[in-house]
């Protein structure tokens, strides 16, 4: 079995190293990640300049002067000697729940695998900090091992959020749907040394829908949240109303 591992925190991130160590016994592992932290990069590709791939002497990890999506794209379309059986992304420093998934470079790296027909799993550690990173890596390896032995049908994309707790305090796995956040905090305006205004993106909003069954609810109650995602963004329930709206405009066929 072959696994392609990436992340969005960069090739020097502790989460990547911990997950690499945990996955080594399970499969032939190739690690390729961004050179720099790319949190919030989403599914962006670098199209305005060429990309270079280097290899770290200390770890053997490949790193790209681009985004998480660039990293997986390069590996799958031009660098990898053989097609992987699974793309894994993480472990991210902080959760990716609800609308976070649209901004997340961690989820984006996994999504790029799905774009090329390779199943993928994204792992994130809830709350900033690595206090229980070894425990999270152990959980991630258990999930990957189970997937390799019992794969889901099709090309699944799983988004996994692991509470930042000791392993023995985790209550197990729970399959969830995405919750919803309040809008993010306003931008923070400051002034640069030349007197020009600059802006920092504000913090993410708190949970709005953290009801039972959501990723927010699961991790708040000590469960590992596993959310199956899909690339089709079509709002199918809105199709009939949208057709009627278009007909009323006199242009629908």
UniProtKB/Swiss-Prot annotation:
GO terms for molecular function: 3'-nucleotidase activity; 5'-nucleotidase activity; exopolyphosphatase activity; metal ion binding; nucleotide binding. InterPro entries: SurE, SurE-like_Pase/nucleotidase, SurE-like_sf. GO terms for cellular component: cytoplasm. Its cofactor is a divalent metal cation. It is an enzyme of class 3 (hydrolase). Disulfide bonds: none annotated. Keywords: Cytoplasm, Hydrolase, Metal-binding, Nucleotide-binding. It catalyses: a ribonucleoside 5'-phosphate + H2O = a ribonucleoside + phosphate. Its EC number is 3.1.3.5. A divalent metal cation binds at residues 8-9, 39, 92. Binds 1 divalent metal cation per subunit. It is found in: Cytoplasm. SUPFAM superfamilies: SurE-like. Nucleotidase that shows phosphatase activity on nucleoside 5'-monophosphates. HAMAP family: SurE. Belongs to the SurE nucleotidase family. NCBIfam families: PRK00346.1-3, PRK00346.1-4, surE. This is 5'-nucleotidase SurE 2. It comes from Burkholderia lata (strain ATCC 17760 / DSM 23089 / LMG 22485 / NCIMB 9086 / R18194 / 383).
């Amino acid at each position: 079995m072959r696994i392609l591992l990436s992340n969005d925190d960069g090739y020097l991130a502790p989460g990547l190293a911990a997950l690499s160590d945990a996955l080594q016994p399970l499969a032939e592992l190739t690690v390729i990640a961004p050179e720099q932290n790319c949190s919030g990069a989403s599914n962006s590709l670098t199209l305005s300049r060429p990309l270079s791939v280097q290899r770290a002497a200390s770890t053997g990890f490949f790193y790209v002067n681009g985004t998480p999506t660039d990293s997986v794209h390069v590996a799958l379309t031009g660098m990898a000697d053989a097609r992987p059986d699974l793309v894994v992304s993480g472990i991210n420093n902080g959760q990716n729940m609800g609308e976070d998934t649209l901004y997340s470079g961690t989820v984006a790296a996994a999504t790029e695998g799905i774009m090329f027909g390779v199943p993928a799993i994204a792992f994130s550690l809830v709350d900033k900090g690595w206090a229980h990173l070894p425990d999270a890596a152990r959980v991630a390896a258990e999930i990957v091992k189970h997937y390799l032995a019992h794969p889901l049908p099709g090309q699944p994309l799983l988004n996994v959020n692991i509470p930042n707790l000791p392993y023995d305090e985790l209550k197990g796995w729970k399959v969830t749907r995405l919750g919803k956040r309040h809008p993010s905090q306003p931008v923070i305006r400051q002034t640069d040394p030349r007197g020009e205004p600059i802006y920092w993106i504000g913090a993410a909003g708190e949970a709005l829908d953290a009801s039972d069954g959501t990723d927010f609810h699961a991790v708040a109650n000590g469960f590992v949240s596993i959310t199956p995602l899909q690339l089709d963004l079509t709002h199918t329930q809105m199709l009939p109303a949208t057709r009627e709206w278009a007909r009323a405009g006199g242009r629908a066929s």
